[in-house]
Amino acid sequence: MGEFYTKGEPREATVATCILNTGNWVLPSDYADEVAYKPPFMHWFIAIFSLPVGHITETTARLPSALSLIGITMMFFYLLYKRTNSYRAFVASIILLTSFEMHRSGLEARVDMTLAFFMIGALISLFKWEEKELKGFPLLIPVFLGGAALVKGPIGILLPCMVFGIYLLILKRYSLWKIIYKNVFIALPALAILLVWYILAYKQGGEHFLNLVYAENFGRFLGMDSKKLGISYELGHEGPFWYYIPAIILGFMPWSLLLIFAAFSISIKKSTQKLSIWQRFINLDKLTLFSIISVVIIITFYAIPSSKRSVYIMPAYPGAAYLLTLLYEWALNKKTILIKLLARIILVISGILVLLIACFHFVDLYSVSTLLLHDTKTLHDISLFSTAFQHPSIFGFLVWFLLLCVFISVWYVLRKETARIVLISTLVLFICTQIFLEGLAYPVFKNGYSSRPFAEKIMSKYDLKNNTYVMNNLKEYSNLYGLNFYMDNNYKNFEKEQPKNGYFITGLSYIDKIKALYNNKYIFKELERTSDRFNDYGDVIVLYRFNQTGKEIKR
């Protein structure tokens, strides 16, 4: 799957590194003195999976997300298989599994997929509980809710209960008080689980921990200013209210292309039905109704705060996948041309990949590109693939050959078979395309932007253990999360400790500012630097040795 090439993955993996190195399972740190403000449930899994090898690896760090995606797919398939038919269950599950957002997140060391697993597990269990008329104590629901809360906080409890409560209200089979009572009934055990961690974490982190909890759970939702919250980082990426509409369409690529095709091919006719839209809505079968409600409520809830990321709405993806599958069934019966159009698009994409790899193998595209292109990043990327594909491994060749064989098979099926078989063949082709990308293409790209080579180089030449310092103020400087992970979470906060001597690492773009700030107190001598800025940090990384001059800082 490749090395870490972004800031997010090594940041999460480093929390687990701290757990193994220090034995602190309650409130570990992830960068110098930076406290991991999220509950560390996912990081516990990473640490446990890493115990046999004794340290955190890229694979063990990504394992919770991969297992969560598999678990979500299995729960979703079983839910549909028992209530619809095997064909619909299979198509919906593959659409969910291979959709761009779910597939991507399932292979990353981030908390979002683990959170989605517990929230989706809770939603499915809540749906099944209503089918039993809310009888008995559903043990799995508090477990799923508690797991979601231990991954990201109270939102893991609040949102599934909100979806379920609105679903029960629309069913009109239960009184308002019973709906409230039943939601409280299942939420309290989960809250108790979360409260235990909060108490233990407060004993370690004190008031600073409470400030972080308030900022993350209330400040982020209300769009409060980070300065007023007393935190040294910004609360996420801002986006407009409608952000999640294109986000979920892009997140379901390529399968959401059918939705776009259908939007231009359906003719709007005046309805002859006497029932209103609302009456038709509440008369839908339970599975369709619950799917619509979960998608609408989850997207609307996350649309309210200014901080937005496409992965936040992944708990809505099973419901959306089911609704999208119904659209595919409509196309199979009414608009088979749309299915074949989608198949041709995916066939072309796969064919381009097959041809491109062959070109890279037989032609030095990097040499050709240098004559036509001048963008250094583009040339760097072409160089990575050109070098790798000119000398592919046996595994790489087998993955390429698999894609070629399936490509030829689908090309034949598209000419001869029915739309149903074409759809299944297209699903298989896209799975093989993803296997090709994950097994051959992505690792080349990821490794080309990893900080690991530089970390290994400087650690072999210098004694950096417990003697390496960085700036840790996200409002002023970017953090070197990738390098920190590959150096075994060994950094200390330079500004707070102000040591007499040691090693200092920063980006080339920051060093003049830092030297000016500490001009009269420290002397910095450059030792090593990366050859370019093509790494997860996005800048030339420089290692310095510093010594204190004994003078005061000029501010």
Regions found by a protein language model. Give the residues of each.
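Membrane-embedded architecture of ER/inner-membrane glycosylation machinery
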Residues: L139, I268-R555
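Membrane-integral, polyisoprenol-dependent glycosyltransferases
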Residues: M1-L341, F360-L365, S393, D532-V540
